[in-house]
């Protein structure tokens, strides 16, 4: 009996692998395969758990019957996935009809096999119980878990105009966030140890700031899926204190600024200041919390400026959703006027396409573009004599520079746009996905559009082709109208 049981286990494993690879071949995406296979695996675990709770022995007949239920669960998962994909691909709502068919299929199986519960033989009763419990588990899992996972990772983001999650993207995100958390833990442990070291706090703060810079540089360096471009025409060395201002697009902005120098302190908002991971670190090195007002920190800022530190501020106050620069607040310019410091503008591009504010746990491909503009001396009155005038004029100056960068980088060769284009089609079937991939490659990423299509106008896309020209126009030339 033991040998036969082992053989059935072997058959179960082989059949599971065959089903998995058959689904993978059919869907063409490992993500859809896992979504279809997971309900079968969960229902199998539920069946085994219920058998253990109810004291039903796992004999030869039960193995065969459980495998039969496993196969039915496979069919149910495929039908549910077909309904979900149809709605995602074409908008047709066929899922409810699939659910109805699944319900009646499960109902007839339960009624047919459930009749054996009235049998007097214990083996027949166990067969009946396993059939009833197994089918209920399979139907509930197929009705709930699979649609929830599909909506969370694919349909939900797409309905908000965001790209769906991919397995590669999730792995990339987990690894980089894990690296970030390891760096935070290391710094927190180091700070705890430094409290015991009899050295001036300013010296310990310099060490921690240096390690923060190294950590930020390391994380950006290990983000291999992201291109980095650093422009520093003025050859800025951060040797003299300044008020550093930059447009705010993403969490990456903080890493970029802190990687430039170990002599940069930041003005932070509530969630950064109270973060359970790095809040204690930034408080130790004397970052500043905007919620408590600048006046409270003015003397500490003067002291830090004398030690050679610059102060970095995002004048917009919050991250942008669409990459467009918002209105500048005058706090940074008030500080520059009060502390008599130069203003150092820095333009950031592409960070919101890598980690979007609306989708913070999905790191995508793209470009981290950093351009350090020339310093604006404290006694330079060309931008106005007062902080209010300087706010408006420097804001216009930076927006003009940012618009120039957008014209230069918003092209079909931008890896962020290419990935966004492909991700519009990846879960709509292997034929559609590979047609689009090959089509885009044959068209050389539609580079011709960079010369032909104006910045503003109305574009008519004639022909079917799946619509990639319209998608790439929408991404690269947002001011054009598509029909």
Where in the sequence are the language-model features?
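Membrane-embedded transmembrane helical bundles of large multi-pass transporters/channels
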Residues: 1-169
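A transmembrane-helix-recognition feature enriched in membrane-embedded lipid enzymes
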Residues: 166-227, 280-281, 428-437
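Non-catalytic C-terminal accessory region of glycerolipid acyltransferases
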Residues: 171, 295-427
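Catalytic core of membrane glycerolipid acyltransferases/transacylases, capturing the structured
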Residues: 191-210, 238-293
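Conserved alpha-helix/loop element of class I SAM-dependent methyltransferases that forms part
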Residues: 439-456
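Conserved class I S-adenosyl-L-methionine
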Residues: 457-465
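Conserved SAM-binding loop of SAM-dependent methyltransferases across substrates and taxa
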Residues: 466-478
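Short beta-strand element of Class I
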Residues: 480-482
């Amino acid at each position: 009996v033991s040998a036969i049981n082992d053989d059935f286990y072997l058959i179960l494993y082989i059949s599971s692998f065959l089903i998995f690879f058959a689904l993978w071949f059919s869907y063409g995406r490992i993500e859809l395969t896992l979504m279809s296979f997971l309900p079968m695996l969960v229902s199998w675990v539920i069946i085994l758990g219920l058998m253990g709770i109810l004291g039903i022995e796992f004999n030869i007949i039960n193995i065969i019957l459980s495998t039969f239920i496993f196969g039915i669960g496979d069919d149910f998962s495929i039908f549910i996935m077909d309904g979900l994909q149809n709605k995602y691909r074409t908008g047709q709502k066929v899922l409810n009809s699939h659910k109805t068919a699944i319900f009646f299929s499960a109902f007839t199986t339960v009624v047919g096999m459930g009749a054996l519960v009235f049998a007097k033989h214990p083996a027949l009763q166990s067969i009946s119980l396993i059939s009833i419990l197994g089918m209920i588990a399979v139907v509930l899992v197929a009705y709930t878990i699979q649609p929830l996972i599909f909506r969370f990772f694919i349909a939900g983001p797409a309905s908000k105009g965001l790209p769906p999650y991919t397995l590669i993207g999730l792995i990339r995100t987990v690894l980089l966030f894990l690296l970030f958390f390891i760096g935070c833990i290391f710094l927190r442990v180091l700070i705890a140890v430094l409290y015991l070291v009899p050295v001036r706090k300013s010296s310990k703060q310099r060490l921690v700031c240096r390690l923060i810079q190294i950590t930020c540089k390391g994380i950006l360096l290990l983000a291999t899926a992201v291109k980095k471009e650093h422009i520093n025409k003025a050859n800025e060395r951060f040797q003299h204190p300044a008020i550093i201002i930059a447009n705010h697009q993403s969490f990456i902005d903080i890493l970029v600024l802190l990687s430039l120098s170990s002599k940069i302190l930041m003005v932070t908002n509530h969630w950064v200041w109270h973060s359970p991971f790095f809040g204690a670190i930034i408080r130790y090195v004397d970052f500043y919390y905007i919620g408590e007002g600048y006046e409270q920190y003015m003397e500490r800022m003067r002291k830090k400026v004398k030690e050679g530190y610059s102060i970095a501020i995002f004048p917009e106050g919050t991250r942008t959703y669409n990459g467009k620069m918002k209105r500048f607040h005058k706090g940074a310019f008030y500080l520059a006027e009060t502390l008599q410091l130069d203003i150092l503008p820095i333009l950031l591009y592409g960070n919101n396409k890598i980690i979007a504010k609306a989708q913070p746990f999905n790191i995508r491909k793209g470009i981290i573009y950093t351009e350090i503009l020339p310093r604006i001396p404290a006694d330079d009155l060309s931008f106005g004599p007062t902080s209010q005038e300087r706010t408006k004029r420097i804001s216009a100056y930076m927006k003009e520079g940012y618009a120039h960068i957008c014209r230069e980088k918003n092209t079909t060769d931008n890896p962020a746009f290419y990935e966004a284009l492909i991700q519009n089609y990846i879960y709509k079937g292997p034929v559609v996905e590979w047609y689009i991939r090959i089509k885009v490659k044959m068209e050389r990423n539609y580079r011709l559009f960079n010369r032909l299509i104006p910045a503003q106008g109305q574009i008519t896309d004639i022909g079917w082709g799946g619509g990639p020209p319209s998608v790439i126009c929408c991404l690269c030339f947002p001011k054009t109208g598509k029909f």
